[in-house]
Each structure stands twice: as C-alpha cells, then as structure tokens.
Amino acid sequence: MKTHYLSIALSVALSGCSLIPDYQRPPAPIQAGWPQGEAYAKLKAGTHRPSQTRDAELNWQVFFRDPVMRELIATALNNNRDLRQTALNVEAYRALHRIERSALLPRANTGVGATRQRLPADLSPTGEAGIQSQYDTTLSMSYELDMFGRLRSLERAALQEYLAAAETQRSMQIALIADVAIAYLSWRSDQAQLDLARSTLASYENSLNLIKSSREVGTASALDVRQARSLVETARVQQTLYTRQVAQDMNALQLLLGTKLPADLPISDVLDQPLAALSTGLPADLLLHRPDIRAAEHRLLAANANIGAARAAFFPSITLTAAAGTASHELDGLFEGGSGLWAFMPRINLPIFTAGRLRGNLDYRNVIKDINVAEYEKSIQTAFREVADGLAARGTFGEQLQAQRDLVDNNQAYYKLAYQRYDEGVDNYLAVLDAQRELFAAQQQFLSDRLNQLSSEVRLFKALGGGWDNISSQPLTAQN
C-alpha cells in the first residue's frame, strides 16, 4: 500500500500535479474497409470517396431535393419536443460545468452583522450583569489550493459531460431529420397504395358486374361469380387497411413535427425524386462524422478525468481563508481608528481512516471507465453495421426495383392479352381475373420496394452522420 501511494505521489511530481490517467483512444474494433461480396459488387464508382468531400454532401438541405420535405424537416427542427429536451439537457450540463469551474477560483464574501446580548454576572468581565452590543463588517476570501488536481479533474469531467450532451443533441437532430423524411415518404407511399387499392376495387367491381350479367345469360358459372367477388372483397380490405395507415402515418408525422401539418401542403412527387448521391469514405471516417461516437468518447474522457479526482482524494487538501474588516461596540465606531480586525486561517485536511470509502470510489471510477470503453467500442460497431447495411441496400435495390418494374410491365401486358383473348371468345373471364390479381400484387410490391429503397438511402444518410452544414472533422474542444 505504501508503495502504491509513493508511486502515485511520484507520478504527481512528474506530471505537473495531475492524477488523470494518460488518455489513449481505444482502437476501433472494426475492419479497415467496408464489407465485400455479391450485395456490394454493383456499387457505383466513387461511393468510397475520401471524407474531405463529404461535408457539403451531408447537408440535409442538399441531400433532400423535395421542397415540401425540406419545409417539414425545418418545421420539426424548430418544434419537436424531444429535440427541445436534448437542448435543455445541454444547457443543464453547461451550468454544471460552470459550477465545477467556479471551484478553481477564490470565493469572496462580504457581510455586515450586529449582535446584542445580555450577559449574566458570572460571565461578564466586570462581574455585573449587563447588555452588550457588537457591530462588525467583514470581507472574507477562501481558496482551495488544487495541488493534486482534484478540482481540475472534476472541472474536466464536467466539461466532457457537457460536450457529450452537445454531441447527443446533434445526434438527435440527425435522427429527427431521418425520421421526418421516412415518415413523409411512408405517408406519400401509403397514399399511393390507397389510390391503387381504390382504382383496383373499381376495376374488380366492374368485372363482378360483368360476370353477374354473364351468369344471367348462362355464359358464366356461380364459381366465376364467387371468384370475382373474392377479388372485390380483397381490394376492399386493402382500401380499408391503407385508409387507416394513411391516417396513422399523418399522426406520426405530426408528432415528429411538433405541430399540425400545414393545411395547404402541396402534393409532391417525392417518391419519384432521387435523393442526392452520398459517398461513404472509409470506416475510420465514422469516428469524425458520427456525433454519437464522439459523444461516447467524451463520456469516456469524463470517466478518465473522474479517476484523477478519485486518486487526488487520497491526498491532503489545503484551504486558505482570510478575513478583514472592522468591529465596534457602537455602530458609529465601525470606521474609527483602532476598529480594524483581520484573520488568516489556513487548513489542511488529510484523510486517515475512511473505512475503504476512497478505495471503493477509485475502484468504482475505474469500472465506470471500462463501461464507457465498451460503450464507445459498441457505438463504433453499431455505426459500421448501419453503414454496411445501407451499402448492401444500395448495391441491391437498384436491380430489385428494375426487376419489379419489369414485372409490373409484364403483368400489364398479360392483363391486356387476357382481356383480348376473353373479348375474342378464346378464354373465359377467369383468366382476366387472374391477370388482374397478378397485376395488383405486382403494383403493390413495386410501391413497397420503392419506399424501402428511398428509406434505406435516408438511413444511410443518417448512419454517415449527415444533417449538418458543417460537421467538424476534429473532436470538439472547450472553444467549440
């Protein structure tokens, strides 16, 4: 134990009275490059351009080209309640930092006092009972000499917690931008699904009426009528489902906006507008561009500083207190000659026996740092996985959408041919119903795939730390 304390004391002397452990950023537990394989083989050249070209591309006002979507995102950034809470958290941590920083400076107080008391005879210096008065005015100052860096360590920890809160706010803003974009895309996509269900229902109802007429003249069977009615009810279910979904999408979007949707919101072709191209850089760039990773590192730095404060608690604390002023038995005598007073009170506190409290506190701070290391590494791994998922989606959705578009075109041709053969008397109407069903399913799937493709691009934008006009390429400092 003595050797342990001696080594700490020696390290204090050699490091300028700071007991904060030397910080070394943990190595990123991810591979140097993005995944390779069939899902990534068709990515366009330039996808992994160096990170210095990415700041402008990650500006959300550039990435989202639809003016209506940009307007909604701006509204959410001004009104969202979750974002407002994170902003208030930043202010709270800023105030805590000011509290810890104030401990590094001397404290001064001034006061004016008056005392009037009756002393019994046995306590009176004259041997007679009497009433005494005393008036005083003082200016006092106290200052703790931070010889072992305890106060400085606490101030640094508070600063890092404040910076972590600021990065968390940035992360929340990026998440909000992505959530609003996806919610708006989902709303418009479900409106398109609802329009498709309505038009398909009308088509199925016309087919049902036609088959009923054929049934009356004996050219269609009861089975034909039942099959046609089944398609009508299926389309009616889809219409009801998407009517509900559109309403729920609007509710979700309004919650994100923090206010009602504008009544005059124009209808845009957002589902047909491609988003701006993104370059991903290298995995190491995530350390600079993801605010959640930077927040995790700030929390790790705070835990590291708290270890310094816990170490310093083993050593003496020295407090200097001084006071000066005047005192008199008469109020008008406070500023007469000979009424001055002063006091100087240095104090040294040395922990001798704390029943293991200091050792337990140091062990606790070391464990908290290990926890923060694990959280920092997990945030990097999570970011890597999110970007890799986005790249896999980008590498495959183009082909999937084209295949689904070809399927829709084929089923439209199939439907026209089936109806032509029915009109010519070659086939019965069941072939037409089957073609209608296949076309409806293909159109629905295309709308779903298109939404998923756009949503995956938005998630990739979020995973890359997008959303800010100027994303610092360096860790935040006190000046930031």
UniProtKB/Swiss-Prot annotation:
Residues where lipid is bound covalently (N-palmitoyl cysteine): 17
Q: Which keywords are on file for this protein?
A: Cell outer membrane, Lipoprotein, Membrane, Palmitate, Signal, Transmembrane, Transmembrane beta strand, Transport
Task: Give the membrane topology.
Answer: Lipid-anchor
Swiss-Prot/TrEMBL induction comment: The ttgDEF operon is induced in the presence of toluene and styrene, but not m-xylene.
Q: Does the keyword Transmembrane apply?
A: yes
- Annotated GO MF terms: efflux transmembrane transporter activity
| Chief place of localization | membrane
Q: Which residues form a coiled coil?
A: none
Q: Which domain of life is it from?
A: Bacteria
- List the Pfam families: OEP
So which residues are the signal peptide here? 1-16
Lipid moiety-binding region for S-diacylglycerol cysteine?
17
Keyword Phosphoprotein on this protein? no
- One annotated Gene Ontology cellular component of this protein: cell outer membrane
| Cellular compartment(s) | Cell outer membrane
What this protein is reported to do is described as: The outer membrane component of an inducible organic solvent efflux pump. Involved in export of toluene and styrene but not of m-xylene, propylbenzene or ethylbenzene. Is not involved in antibiotic or AMP efflux.
Family under the similarity heading: Belongs to the outer membrane factor (OMF) (TC 1.B.17) family.
Q: What is this protein called?
A: Toluene efflux pump outer membrane protein TtgF
Query: Which species is the source of this protein?
Result: Pseudomonas putida (strain DOT-T1E)
